[in-house]
Structures are given as structure tokens and as C-alpha cells.
């Protein structure tokens, strides 16, 4: 299947509208309801220092990359049953691709 090439600006709009209530992306950003996402790519689930993850997130044991995020963002509660993330997901592949493109640029 593969992750569609995303548009960073469209992804930023999605992040602001759907994610920023609970997440930050900048280096040293505070955890909110959800963890700060800086350094997300290449990190295992449940590993942002200082955030209280559910056992389900800690036990999932996958590494975040384009493919794992693409699947997770479609339906987070299906991908990690027991996660406390209340977001229902992004059903449209192009929206997930846009968001992933933004996250890749914003969380380095």
C-alpha cells in the first residue's frame, strides 16, 4: 500500500485542527493530555520521557515511522487497544500522508 506523499502545509493545518489540543511538537515542548511528539520518528511506542503512558502503549513495542504512523492514525484504538488517545483517527489516506509529512518536518 505505502504512505502517500504528503503536503507539509496541509498536514500542519490538520495538526492544528485535530492534534494540537493534546500534543506539542517543538523540542522541549510540554506534555499536554498527550505527549510532546518531538523526536517521534525512530522512537518506540510509550517512550517520551516524563509522560505517563498506558501499559498498552508501552507494551506495543513498535517503532514509529511512516508506515506504523499511517496505520495507527487510521484508527488509534484498534492499533493500540487500551491507549488513552481519544482521537477517532483519520480515515482518508491523503490526510494521513499530509499529517505524517508535517510531523516528519516538525518533530526533528
Curated annotation (Swiss-Prot):
Job description of the protein: Electron carrier protein. The oxidized form of the cytochrome c heme group can accept an electron from the heme group of the cytochrome c1 subunit of cytochrome reductase. Cytochrome c then transfers this electron to the cytochrome oxidase complex, the final protein carrier in the mitochondrial electron-transport chain.
Superkingdom assignment: Eukaryota
Record has Transmembrane as a keyword: no
Primary location group: mitochondrion
Taxonomic source organism: Sarcophaga peregrina (Flesh fly)
Record InterPro entries: Cyt_c-like_dom (IPR009056), Cyt_c-like_dom_sf (IPR036909), Cyt_c_1A/1B (IPR002327)
PROSITE patterns: CYTC (PS51007)
The entry's keywords: Electron transport, Heme, Iron, Metal-binding, Mitochondrion, Respiratory chain, Transport
Positions contributing to heme c binding: 19, 22-23, 85
Gene Ontology cellular component list: mitochondrial intermembrane space
Modified how: Binds 1 heme c group covalently per subunit.
UniProt GO MF annotations: electron transfer activity; heme binding; metal ion binding
Protein name: Cytochrome c
Family according to the record: Belongs to the cytochrome c family.
Compartmental location: Mitochondrion intermembrane space
PANTHER family noted in UniProt: CYTOCHROME C
Amino acid at each position: 500500500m505505502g504512505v502517500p506523499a504528503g503536503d507539509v502545509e496541509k498536514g500542519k493545518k490538520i495538526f492544528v485542527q485535530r492534534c494540537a489540543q493534546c500534543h506539542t511538537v517543538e523540542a522541549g515542548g510540554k506534555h499536554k493530555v498527550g505527549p510532546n511528539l518531538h523526536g517521534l520518528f525512530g522512537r518506540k511506542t510509550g517512550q517520551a520521557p516524563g509522560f505517563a503512558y498506558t501499559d498498552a502503549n508501552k507494551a506495543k513495542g513498535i517503532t514509529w515511522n511512516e508506515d506504523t504512523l499511517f496505520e495507527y492514525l487510521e484508527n488509534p484504538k484498534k492499533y493500540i487497544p487500551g491507549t488513552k488517545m481519544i482521537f477517532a483517527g483519520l480515515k482518508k489516506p491523503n490526510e494521513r500522508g499530509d499529517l505524517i509529512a508535517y510531523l516528519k518536518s516538525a518533530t526533528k
